[in-house]
Amino acid sequence: MFALLPGVAGAAGNSVTGKNVALIGDSMTWIGGDSCDIARGWTSHFRLLASPASMNVYARSGATWTNAPDTKVDTEAFYDVLHDDNVLYTQAVRLVIDVCSGVSRCPDLIILYAGANDAWFASRRPGIFTAGSTTADGSLPASLAGSVRAVCGLLRENLPDSRMILVTPAQMTKAPASAVERVSAVIDSVGCSLGIQVIRTDRDGPINAAEERGRHPRLTSDGIHTNPEGAAELARFFIREIGRYSEE
């Protein structure tokens, strides 16, 4: 069991305890398991420290915010690697379907934590930093900004009572710092324009890429995915940031 840092219990109690939480994202969330009980994932520590009523995981390893030119929405398909159809928009559609059909409770809080694969595999998303109305499959934007806006719009329209939080990727060794910063800046810009809280993990989070290089990374197992200590630090950071915003 990891000790609480000062202020964590209060922040969690104010904004997360007893709430239903939905999780959308990539492997950084997925590695905690569907039951949020695997120690190397931040969700396991978040569950123990914040005590939400429920946590439903829609995240998939390999997922990106950004749609590819050939992205199709297929809620029946399952991918846990980088794939044109492994995108956050599809996860959001699954969540909406589950809530509308009564499979899941309407979440009080939706945490959307992704962007690592957008930075790492930007070449696989050719429209990532383009502007304008480029679309995939005739309807989905193929830019990062457009993709973030589309996901948030879908959730806001169908789950208007759910609070959304966008979380930028943590620093990592798998992609240049400039790529992580650029992806994070786009997510931040869209979130701010929509009035949605953004947690800048790349800038303010506990993971420092310089400390993760070499033979003995401190908070990750491979320069990107957290080890149990890193997962606990990340969970504490998220709880503090969520609580701080709630008190403003």
Residue ranges and their predicted role:
Residues 34, 73, 169-248:
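Catalytic His-Asp segment of secreted/periplasmic serine-dependent ester chemistry enzymes
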Residues 9-10:
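Cleavable N-terminal signal peptides
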Residues 117-142, 170-182:
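Serine-dependent acyl-ester chemistry module
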Residues 24-27, 58-63, 112-117, 167-171, ...:
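Active-site-proximal beta-strand/loop segments in catalytic clefts of secreted hydrolases
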Residues 47, 51, 115, 153-160, ...:
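Sec-exported extracytoplasmic/periplasmic mature domains
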Residues 1-4:
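Bacterial N-terminal signal peptides
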Residues 18-22, 30-128, 133:
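Conserved SGNH/GDSL esterase-like catalytic core that processes O-acyl groups on lipids
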Residues 113-117, 149-184:
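Active-site segments of SGNH/GDSL-like serine hydrolases
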